[in-house]
Amino acid sequence: IESVDSIELAEKIARRAVMRGITVGVLLEVNESGEASKSGCPASHAIDLAQRIGNMGGLQLQGLMTIGAHVSDETTIRAGFAHLRKTRDQILASGAPGTEHCTELSMGMTGDMELAIAEGATIVRVGTGIFGERAFI
């Protein structure tokens, strides 16, 4: 699940996973751009939330996810991706229990995937590049 953005959501998923006797891989969604139109926890809370999620039964924290800033300035977009990578590195370096699998960086979509890859993305989301623009009817 790539869009866990709060402790409350993580706890709900964890409870259901434990009831079913499974472990669910999750990515913590971080709002690196600070844009109100985007989901995700504030970047300043990411390390604490990651460590708390890592301690939950039924979940395996596998990485972080963000959507790049919706701006034309590549420097701004890259800065958000670079910050997410640094945050991931800090989480891993902390050695906190349950964070050792926090290796994935899901960042970058069709329009900014090259920037994301340059900043260390391990997962990119390229739906528009494959399927074309969405048709809103």
Where are the model-predicted features located?
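Conserved alpha/beta-domain cores
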Residues: 1-113, 119, 131-133
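Active-site loop ensemble at the mouth of alpha/beta enzyme cores that anchors a bound cofactor
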Residues: 123, 136-137
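Active-site-proximal glycine-rich helix-loop-beta segment
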Residues: 120-122, 127
